[in-house]
Design a protein with these regions (language model features):
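Non-catalytic, mostly N-terminal accessory regions of nucleic-acid modification and defense proteins
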Residues: 1-106, 164-175
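Conserved S-adenosyl-L-methionine
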Residues: 84-175
């Protein structure tokens, strides 16, 4: 199913933005179940549960249920991961402080760049503090870890940042 989601963008402008997005999802993991049937059952329950969620008026962007839920889960995972969680997640308070310091007196900025963007929490905090329309040319980031790079891209999509408004690269910032 994840490959079908990626393939749905083939031939469109967003093709490269979705390519490899779910590469790190291991649907054969024993953590999902000891047999293929049990793993499939859990995945079906998950996808059906997401499909049945009442997300309110998503089209008017009055809520950000997926994005907020994702951030919450990332926060919980990072805090449980201890020191290693800092490799991919900047705490919300730190992100907000950095954003406010970097944008003092500004109501609009050209772009936001994070050279070690992790899951994208700092990039998205700039959007929350200034507003999506105040960031004219989008969000840019680099992340060396492929798994974290994909987390960032998923995070952008879940926060309704269009594929044409962000450019996240899986690269070493220092090279």
């Amino acid at each position: 199913i994840f490959k079908n989601i990626e393939n749905s963008a083939n031939g469109t402008e967003s093709e490269s933005d979705l390519k490899g997005l779910f590469d790190d999802i291991d649907v054969n993991s024993n953590k999902l179940g000891s047999t293929v049937a049990k793993r499939n059952e859990k995945l079906v329950k998950l996808l059906n549960g997401v499909g049945e969620m009442n997300l309110g008026d998503v089209k008017d962007h009055s809520i950000d249920a997926f994005g907020d839920a994702y951030e919450y889960l990332m926060t919980m995972y990072a805090s449980n991961a201890g020191k290693s969680g800092g490799e991919f997640f900047t705490p919300a308070d730190v992100s907000e402080l950095l954003t406010r310091l970097g944008t003092v007196g500004k109501t609009e900025i050209n772009k936001v760049y994070d050279p070690a963007c992790g899951s994208g929490s700092l990039l998205l905090k700039a959007e929350k503090v200034l507003g999506k329309e105040a960031i004219r040319n989008g969000f840019y980031g680099q992340e060396i870890n492929i798994t974290t790079y994909n987390l960032c891209r998923i995070n952008m999509f879940l926060h309704d940042v269009g594929f044409d408004k962000f450019n996240i690269a899986c690269e070493d910032t220092l090279i």
